[in-house]
Amino acid sequence: MESTQPEVRLGKVAVADVTLAFREVGSPRGVPVVLVHALGSGAATWAAFGARLAAHGRRVLALDLRGHGGSSWTDAYSLTSMCDDVLAFLDAQGIGRTDLVGHSVGGAVAVLVAQRQADRVRRLVVEDTPPPPERAPEPLAPVTEPADPLPFEWRLIEPIITELRTPDPGWRERLKLISAATLLVGGGPASHVSPDALARVNAAVPDCRLVTVEDAGHRVHSVRPEEFWAVVAPFLCGTPAGEVTRPRE
């Protein structure tokens, strides 16, 4: 049988001081949705989810954040620079307004985008991303760099994790800047991101809903892809959960 899996278009685009690698599927004329991966992951983590979005007529773009995969490995890393990269990527692709989906660190980046240029985000999905801590946590134990090659730059871990773990008294006020309809997806007690933490985010974003996929853990879209799709598809595509489809093989 002839496969109807969507064609994956691989590309790179130079923006400011970096080159960003990305994967694109679906109709170039479809409503765009940009997918942002977690720390240490990459664009390919969204392959199955992106294919299903493409089957619903969406233009799907998943990028490697700086320091990951085929994108530039740079001298400095921060959530702000990653946010700048995503906004520059939208400009380079000619995308004025988009849906945005982010997992973990990618969710933190997506939130920054939706705060800084609220008019550019139509719908926002944030998967298991914690808010800043209420107080400074205990220091993390040092972790030794693995001997085997990694698909990301080891040097980016410390500054990004430090930024995520730093208390930020103004975070609630900045979440009020988000005008996009927002869906938070949590992984339940099996995740290190507590339901209470996600509830604080849910209470701060003006137009927001929180859904928990019980026992999914931190990587909801990978560990529980069917449940993740059933939750996110109606929000992004207006697809009833009982009518979700996947590309045929």
Regions found by a protein language model. Name each.
Residues 83-98:
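Conserved acidic catalytic loop of the alpha/beta-hydrolase fold
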